[in-house]
Amino acid sequence: MEIKILNKTDTEIQVEIKGESHTMMNALKSCLLEDKAVKVATYDIEFPGISDPVLYVRTDKSEDPIDAIKVAAKKLADECDDFLKIFGKKAKA
């Protein structure tokens, strides 16, 4: 995975995330939208199968968009860890 910041202001960011698909982007977008400071979170894959996704996030002035992405990514990682633990226990049963 490579990450390239395309545009950044105090309240907006566009980030290209190379090598990712709708699976990761939808999950990240969902976590971002749970943050009250995030006003818009969306992504676009201009040409599926060819283009890399570009994430767009806009926040209110209370949170930097980079911090919002970091918080959402941590939350997503924690949710995956929880799933793995629960699934591991059930799979042994």
From Swiss-Prot:
- EC number(s) from the headed UniProt entry: 2.7.7.6
Q: Which reaction does it catalyse?
A: RNA(n) + a ribonucleoside 5'-triphosphate = RNA(n+1) + diphosphate
Question: What GO molecular-function term can you cite, just one?
Answer: DNA-directed RNA polymerase activity
Which coarse location class applies to the principal site listed for this UniProt protein? cytoplasm
Pfam families (alphabetical): RNA_pol_L_2
Arranged from A to Z, the UniProt key words for this protein are:
Cytoplasm, DNA-directed RNA polymerase, Nucleotidyltransferase, Transcription, Transferase
Tagged with keyword Phosphoprotein: no
Q: Does the keyword Ribosomal protein apply?
A: no
Q: Which GO CC annotations does the UniProt entry carry?
A: cytoplasm; DNA-directed RNA polymerase complex
Instruction: Give the record's GO biological process terms.
Output: DNA-templated transcription
EC class of the enzyme, as a word = transferase
Protein's cellular compartments: Cytoplasm
Tell me how this protein assembles. Part of the RNA polymerase complex.
Role: DNA-dependent RNA polymerase (RNAP) catalyzes the transcription of DNA into RNA using the four ribonucleoside triphosphates as substrates.
- Spell out the family assignment given in the record's similarity comment: Belongs to the archaeal Rpo11/eukaryotic RPB11/RPC19 RNA polymerase subunit family.
- Name this protein carries in UniProt: DNA-directed RNA polymerase subunit Rpo11
Q: Which organism is it from?
A: Methanocella arvoryzae (strain DSM 22066 / NBRC 105507 / MRE50)
